[in-house]
Swiss-Prot record:
Activity regulation information from UniProt: Activated by molar concentrations of KCl or NaCl. Inhibited by EDTA in vitro.
Other comment: The reaction follows an ordered Bi-Bi kinetic mechanism, involving an ordered binding of NADP(+) and D-glucose, followed by an ordered released of gluconolactone and NADPH.
GO terms (BP aspect): non-phosphorylated glucose catabolic process
CDD domains: glucose_DH (cd08230)
Keyword Metal-binding: yes
Designated name of the protein: Glucose 1-dehydrogenase
Disulphide connectivity of cysteines: none
Species this protein is from: Haloferax mediterranei (strain ATCC 33500 / DSM 1411 / JCM 8866 / NBRC 14739 / NCIMB 2177 / R-4)
């Protein structure tokens, strides 16, 4: 079968041939439909994130997948089920407490593999196998865009944890600010638009000039575009308003600190970006004082698990059709897979199609 991989010492994905996998007991064989491309894939290709499977000279890419079960094997799945796989798997050392209690998304770095990212091959292949417990059934109507379920699930977890930090008191947020107008930021903005919290004012930070398709989406969602070149995060309260909730998806280290200044009293920020090392000066006293005297919180969040994928299938049904159409700017066949990795100002979200239902 064909697969898309990055090889050691190279910085461009290529198509390779691999044997079609055979499911072991407890696993199903899945025919891949589509696999999304995101910033993590670009980081893995560039060598800035992730790692190769032990003893292998390549890593099959892809962690945002949707497929159809072709061989249920000895599982309770059925042939024809549309499924989305989760990402984390036990490391080479075997299972650990996080996997044993079915919370692999809470495992610290080094205590897991991630398919298509670190230590385990991903889903950019014509077929893949997976244990049943890591496959989430989704409605057949979501098959075409099922590769969006994984990124939606990332925000489902972040919201769950951020909201839990405010659950000890009456918290009635009205403003939310998404930092980052990439595909994850835009998905999150759309999710906040339909969130049960009923946000009255939404904002999204970027650094692009008009005309721009992401700005068009932001404004179509009735949100305000904030250009960070004109209004840095710490100035947002003076120019717009204090924010009850902030979602950071830029990976820009200063945003973690500046978010505290932009939060309203009792507000919470969710940090999802994974930056490189960067040392800079911070008024630690002001930061500490602001957190304490105004009951603010910051929550770090990474990955997601089955319950978040299941919640994502529900959220998916609430997102406007026009939004999904505008968000996905390209679905490319395997023969033209390189186009899915293009990264320009007209590209928002892309996917590679391996087969159809």
């Amino acid at each position: 079968m064909k697969a898309i991989a990055v090889k050691r010492g190279e910085d461009r994905p290529v198509v390779i041939e691999k044997p079609r996998p055979e499911p072991e007991s407890g696993e199903a064989l899945v025919r891949t439909l589509r696999v999304g491309v995101d910033g993590t894939d670009h980081e893995v290709i560039a060598g800035g994130h992730g790692g190769f499977p032990e003893g292998e000279d390549h890593l099959v890419l892809g962690h945002e997948a949707v497929g159809v079960v072709v061989d249920p094997n000895d599982t309770e799945l059925e042939e024809g089920d549309i499924v989305v796989p989760t990402v984390r798997r036990p490391p080479a050392s075997g299972t650990n407490e996080y996997f044993e209690r079915d919370q692999p998304d809470m495992a610290p770095d080094g205590m897991y593999f991630e398919r298509g990212i670190v230590g385990a091959h991903g889903y950019m292949s014509e077929f893949f196998t997976s244990p049943e417990k890591y496959l989430v059934r989704i409605p057949r109507s979501q098959a075409e865009l099922g590769f969006l379920i994984e990124p939606i699930s990332i925000t489902e977890k972040a919201l769950e944890h951020a909201y839990a930090s405010r659950s000890a008191f009456d918290w009635d947020p009205s403003s939310a600010f998404v930092l980052g107008n990439g595909s994850l930021g835009l998905l999150t903005l759309a999710m906040l638009k339909v969130d049960d919290k009923g946000y009255e004012n939404l904002y999204c930070l970027g650094r692009r000039d008009r005309p721009d398709p992401t700005i068009d989406i932001i404004e179509e969602l009735d949100a305000t575009y904030v250009d960070s070149r004109q209004t840095p995060v710490e100035d947002v309260p003076d120019v717009y308003e204090q924010m009850d909730f902030i979602y950071e998806a830029t990976g820009f280290p200063k945003h973690a600190i500046q978010s505290v200044q932009a939060l309203a009293p009792n507000g919470v920020g969710a940090l999802l970006g994974v930056p490189s090392d960067w040392a800079f000066e911070v008024d630690a006293g002001a930061f500490h004082r602001e957190m304490v005297l105004h009951n603010k919180a910051l929550v770090g969040s990474v990955n997601s698990h089955v319950e978040h994928f299941e919640a994502a299938t529900v959220t998916f049904t609430k997102l406007p059709k026009w939004f999904l159409e505008d968000l996905v700017t390209g679905v490319h066949p395997l023969s033209e897979f390189e186009a899915a990795f293009d990264d320009d100002d007209t590209t928002i979200k892309t996917a590679i199609e391996f087969s159809t239902v």
